[in-house]
């Protein structure tokens, strides 16, 4: 490493513990009584979903390291075993706060709002008992598969993340003497709604319960020859980290399909049970799943809080939700010109979800239909369930255009979807590429090659986020349309590199990982340090999802020690420490957790007054810089530069949704007393709506202008 004096374990935060702090920031939104009630419930659901993925991937990976006897320490000087111990302590605390928030704050508040939630079937009224028993007979009983365990029937395979009910049974006709206890389990069917609306005791109220409570109440109907001693829900989390040997795999698609099946049956790494579970039932689960100690979570409430999103979706409670924001039209496209003409007139900046994602979809759609378009090339990492972009690409191939699509099969938890899309695109006649061996392709780029009067012209869309029309309404991302030939040449080179083995001798504008992106960033950070040493103004501002690359962090420490002012917007993991005397006193870190998920990557360097701005798909993480194909691109249009600087400025001034990293390692919200409240996300919504409205008004006024049918001088003559 270049900056060895800054490469000490005490200067870094462990990646996993930093992630837990991020989930804690999400949880703090659920606890914020200034938020609408249903939004708080949504954030609580998100913390649960986040924690599931964290265990299936990150904790699973650490457990693999322990099993393999791996003793090497991480950048913070912790072994895998030490990390697991610290993770366990902090995640148990997190889960405790989750359920305290649910039981003590949200459930009573929901009751006041007219939504009664019954989490225990013992609380049903007689009328409700009658309803749920009939509901069980009509809708649930035919779907259930009770599974017993005895000498002829081994313990059943329990699928990852499924909710199950375990029961202890005793035969009804057992003679007096020692009671024989049997075990049985039944999976709560995921094909049925987990949140069930039942008759309410109060007029004007809605009452809901959970499917597992209906099953638990009626479980004796599944075991007619037995007495049910006890029945309790449980849930397991398995290792879902896919080990794929790409060098050995003859067909990557087939290999991933094989591994996906194994994901359901990986090692059990976490067991969630009701805190009142019968110890005898718990002992059976512990033995069968080989789970002990801290890997067992005793839950004071319903298991798997992701179901709160279903409660969020119940009709009639809009007054307890944030008003739904409709992405505004993009002013540049609010005219009757075709999309290619608009791009020829100048680069176009998009800021989602404040601006609509429609121009990106229309770009591919129009290219698919345009007889002058010869080729379309695109990278796809995560796409929506019914993707209009996939449909347009398929149509383009059917229309005889050359269509090349890189579908990243290794996009975690989207592998199955991407396999389906890859097969569909191939069937339509597209050239489908699965990426480079050993590297995930995470870059976001589309190239359209069009025949025009002056010859071939290349149109490029570059972005920080996925080509996913669904998440584009929920994630904050930036993108640019351009037909600058230098970008076009580089885009062609990227696709040639992905589809063949050709790497260009030089790149005009794009910075590509893993080739030289990290080196380029380090050089730009060093350049700021040199400016600072000469007494010139030196400033770095960067926005990303996560920061954990040790070389980049060491370079930032070096720049800070030279006097460079460094402002960082890091939504998630941050392994950098602020406030280390003489090292990171000039570094300020904030994290925005709001209604939209902050996802864009923006990098600003003062460069002695010749400002440079870059955007792209890469975070400052080893996986992005060393193990993925990523693209970062410069922003050269002065008008767009101003817009991006406004984005950064507003987010650095946010005092409503921003959490500030302290030297202690804790994140704290700003003291807002006596200050004008700035919620950057709300402000961007307002600005985008106003701009779209102004552009629409201008278009109407242009149409009203009287244009003589003949030149004025001809009329006078």
Where are these regions (language model features)?
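N-terminal localization/anchoring segments of enzymes in phospholipid and broader phosphate metabolism
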Residues: 1-540, 558, 562, 574-717
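Cofactor-pocket helix-loop regions in the catalytic cores of large enzyme subunits
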Residues: 545
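A generic "binding-loop/recognition-motif" signal
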Residues: 548, 572
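Glycine/threonine-rich ATP-lid/beta-loop region of ATP-binding domains
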Residues: 550-553, 557
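Hydrophobic alpha/beta core scaffold segments
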Residues: 565-569
